[in-house]
A protein has these predicted regions:
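Short beta-alpha junction loops
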Residues: 68-73, 129-130, 157-162, 238-241
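C-terminal catalytic/acceptor-binding lobe
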Residues: 22, 202-301
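A short acidic, often aromatic-flanked loop/helix-cap motif at beta-alpha or helix-coil junctions
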Residues: 97, 101-106, 161-164, 240-243
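N-terminal anchoring/stem segment of glycosyltransferases
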Residues: 1-104, 109-122
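A short acidic (Asp/Glu
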Residues: 17-20, 76-81, 107-109, 134-139, ...
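A structural signal for short, well-ordered beta-strand segments and their strand-loop junctions
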Residues: 7, 66-67, 123-125, 152-157, ...
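Short beta-strand-to-loop acidic/aromatic patch adjacent to the donor-nucleotide binding site
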Residues: 120-131
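Conserved catalytic core of nucleotide-sugar-dependent glycosyltransferases
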Residues: 131-209, 214-219, 223
Length: 301
């Protein structure tokens, strides 16, 4: 059995998030932390990804690492990828590809599958800043995937119900409006080919509009499995295979699920915000109160 782990990357600075945030339904710490202040930080991140792959046994004897770069013309990064392409690592080799920077990570997933679909039996998709780095991470996923009838996509972060704003553009409804955070997860080549046949691609947006990339990629790709009669399934609740890169690199313990108190506080804040946001005046008043409260708790020195 041959398998491929696809890592989507892009040599640009990213939105700064020092800690993961609560998002999704069910609620979890799935809005992952990330600290990538420059393109060179991304080069270092790719090196870190590779260092982990060299250390960790994926549980499958033939696993290649495919790194797909959404090219923004960063020469140092492009040269680095060129240098490591073909490099042998334990259990396989590194393959690097450059493509036009369209469709974000989800366009990169399509590119990798389109190019290599006849070489591998399973594909595992992730982004460079969410690390799938636990012993036997590939074997565990394949075993879980094959233990479910009609499994189409195994979410390596978690599945989530999606907002009604996505219903119309993706032709969704209450029964099938489910996706997976980051479109991070595993599927078989057999099923991916069925998705590809129906849509002519692994779903993504052929452009750079951020919200459309999320709609037609992060939401559209995982939900496409449901549309062809399969299911999105999850890892057991206590099993964590994917960790934000920033947490792992700084040795910060990653917490996937919130406590009951954290859940209550999250929904309490959201309810209060909705109440005060009925007008710009009340919202401004509420935000001023919050600012004053924060200054009282943690005054600037």
């Amino acid at each position: 059995m041959n398998v491929a782990k696809v890592i989507a990357t892009c040599f640009t600075k990213r939105t700064l998030r020092l800690k993961s945030s609560l998002v999704g339904d069910p609620l979890g710490y799935f809005g992952h932390s990330q600290v990538l202040r420059s393109p060179e930080d991304v080069v270092d991140l790719i090196k870190y990804n590779i260092s982990l792959e060299k250390k960790i046994n994926p549980g499958i004897s033939k696993r290649d690492l495919i790194i797909v770069n959404n090219d923004v013309g960063y020469k140092n990064g492009n040269n680095f990828l060129r240098e490591i392409s073909g490099l042998k690592i334990p259990y396989g080799k590194i393959i690097t590809c450059n493509r036009k920077n369209i469709g974000m990570s989800f366009g990169a997933y399509d590119y990798a599958f389109r190019k290599f679909k006849d070489r591998y039996d399973y594909f595992l998709f992730t982004e460079d800043d969410t690390l799938i780095a636990k012993k036997n991470y590939f074997k565990i996923g394949i075993d879980i995937f094959n233990s479910y009838k009609k499994a189409g996509f195994l979410a390596y972060i978690h599945s989530t119900k999606v907002d009604k704003m996505y219903y119309k553009p993706l032709n969704l409804n209450r029964k099938n409006a489910i996706s997976a955070h980051g479109a991070t997860g595993l599927s078989s080549t057999e099923i991916l080919k069925k998705v590809f046949k129906k849509y002519g691609k692994l779903p993504h947006y052929k452009g750079n509009d951020y919200q459309k990339c999320i709609t037609y990629g992060e939401v559209g790709f995982p939900s496409s499995f449901i549309k062809i009669g399969y299911k999105i399934i999850d890892l057991p609740k206590g099993l964590v295979l994917t960790i934000p890169a920033y947490d792992l690199m700084t040795k910060k313990k990653y917490k996937k699920w919130p406590s009951n108190i954290e859940i209550f506080y999250y929904y309490f804040k959201r309810t209060i915000y909705k109440i005060f946001s009925i007008s710009s005046l009340t919202l401004s008043f509420y935000l001023k109160i919050l600012s004053c409260a924060k200054n009282m708790i943690a005054p600037n020195n």
